[in-house]
Amino acid sequence: KFALFSVLTLLSFHAVFSFTPLHTQHPLDPITKEEFLAVQTIVQNKYPISNNKLAFHYIGVDDPEKDLVLKYETSPTLISIPRKIFVVAIINSQTHEILIDLTIKSIVSDNIHNGYGFPVLSAAEQFLAIDLPLKYPPFIASVNKRGLNISEIVCSSFTMGWFGEEKNSRTVRVDCFMKESTVNIYVRPITGITIVADLDLMKIVEYHDRDTEAVPTAENTEYQVSKQSPPFGPKQHSLTSHQPQGPGFQINGTSVSWANWKFHIGFDVRAGIVISLASIYDLEKHKSRRVLYKGYISELFVPYQDPTEEFYFKTFFDSGEFGFGLSTVSLIPNRDCPPHAQFIDTYIHSADGTPIFLENAICVFEQYGNIMWRHTETGIPNESIEESRTEVDLAIRTVVTVGNYDNVLDWEFKTSGWMKPSIALSGILEIKGTNIKHKDEIKEEIHGKLVSANSIGIYHDHFYIYYLDFDIDGTQNSFEKTSLKTVRIVDGGSKRKSYWTTETQTAKTESDAKITIGLAPAELVVVNPNIKTAVGNEVGYRLIPAIPAHPLLTEDDYPQIRGAFTNYNVWVTPYNRTEKWAGGLYVDHSRGDDTLAVWTKKNREIVNKDIVMWHVVGIHHVPAQEDFPIMPLLSTSFELRPTNFFERNPVLKTLPPRDFTWPGCSN
């Protein structure tokens, strides 16, 4: 699951998450280079590396109290919020939770974690682990037995999960691949070998060579453009993107202003991109109105569906085990983002706490081409009425690459008040080698599809869970489910025999808000029951969910115990500053005792409270030959749409953009 990435040097318009002095940032700003260095110094002063084995596994902003942040938004010069950093470090094989106050440059607390699970893996220890087999005599013997060249082998580390063991060490599986004749290593696995490495001991603690399956051929697996030969695919014509009036958005530090929207962009080494303090200007009320306090992907659960020794452990939690922020890669201008995009750089950290510059981590751009609204009126005699408005969206994009998969993550904003988080998957299938070359040779369950000779693409899922802390016109919100009900007409009062109507229920507790989306239609809305429109409706925002995908593992299966937050498509909890990670704070080798599913057993009240919605977006992936050797985008999305939030269509008075013609060109 671990793969290397190079930080590309690219020319573009940039903003950088870096501020000096330390105390001038917004309370939710990402950690800067200077802050990473300060944290490194403070911790190393207490635990000198000369006589301590110290590794930083998470360095993140300790969320300030929400009420202080909201006061800061209105009176930044009157509110002073201490800048606190939360650190998870492994020191002499013990996991420490260290809280640092950078305002006074000292450690506030230092506690040892004695529970289940381990922190996010570091890149440094994975580098060391994947090098172990190449120097391990039994593995070298297995390679020679297969007639392979050890110099053409690369390895990758994979988290192992938990399968009922009483005790766990910080171990990973190490799988190896052939890089001979192709850089597409994941489609050329060396199967039949089990390698387990202990990350604390940094040695191989278990090794088995079970059987020999063919290594899939390198033929037709190369994806680099420089290695392609004719005939080429469909020709793409160049497109010039030009905004003669300049971009419609402004980036001021970490604050983005666009059209009627204003929001804050944050970045965390575990969550990746974080959207905060999203508010929209109401033209009729002449003020900005709060919508979303914070939104991000809390976890990604990827269980593979092969129970054999080769694959059973592959049930990954990409955010909690590898870190979405740590796995964010540099975006490629004119490829990942359009020519008119602007880029934002940021910093992540290494295992020794050193800041690492990440160029082009985020891009911001406007998208054109859709229709905002339109109507052609033909019902008025002797009049021809045609009105149409162009839709212009604002997109915020990052790409997270965890091993073989690339996750293209967007947040889209529309002037109509919509927000649209979307996910697009590309990259390489997880391939299992086989001696089978044709479908007719399959005589038993292979747990996937034969996508090429000697290559099985394993069935698997992708379950993303979004953390959505709504603040609809304030923090006191409720969650409503409006069901659509069929009514049969029995009194003969109409020529119709049936119609449908609605029935609304307000969720009183967390149990009421556990929603499985299926055939029964329902509207799911977060409302502010204290604020109503002129006609008496509660103001709110509606979730238009992604196409539902439900877990198919049994609830007593160990991976599903750890990933129980996928048991429902929607959850609602009261806001709790410490409940950030749906799979728990410590996910590697976790046992499912600190998850969203466990928290909600308290069945807390959620009526007219500060509440958080959690939405699970899932994809069941049955591989096909078109996914090989590299996948075209597989995408899904959901929408957050104002529902009785405005008095009327908020973009009714939007004027069409001025037509622009290039000099020397004609229509």
Curated annotation (Swiss-Prot):
Classification via SUPFAM superfamilies: Amine oxidase catalytic domain, Amine oxidase N-terminal region
Keyword Oxidoreductase recorded: yes
A biological process term (GO) from this entry: amine metabolic process
Annotated positions binding Mn(2+): 469-471, 610-611
Disulfide bonds: 155-176, 337-363
Modification 2',4',5'-topaquinone occurs at: 405
PTM comment text: Glycosylated; contains two carbohydrate chains per monomer. Topaquinone (TPQ) is generated by copper-dependent autoxidation of a specific tyrosyl residue.
Biased composition (Polar residues): 218-229
Signal sequence, start to end: 1-18
Assembly, per entry: Homodimer.
Cofactors named for this entry: Cu cation; Zn(2+); L-topaquinone; Mn(2+)
UniProt keyword annotations, A-Z: Copper, Disulfide bond, Glycoprotein, Metal-binding, Oxidoreductase, Signal, TPQ
Chemical reaction(s) catalysed: a primary methyl amine + O2 + H2O = an aldehyde + H2O2 + NH4(+)
Binding-site residues, substrate: 316-327, 402-407
Pfam families: Cu_amine_oxid (PF01179), Cu_amine_oxidN2 (PF02727), Cu_amine_oxidN3 (PF02728)
Protein name: Primary amine oxidase
EC number: 1.4.3.21
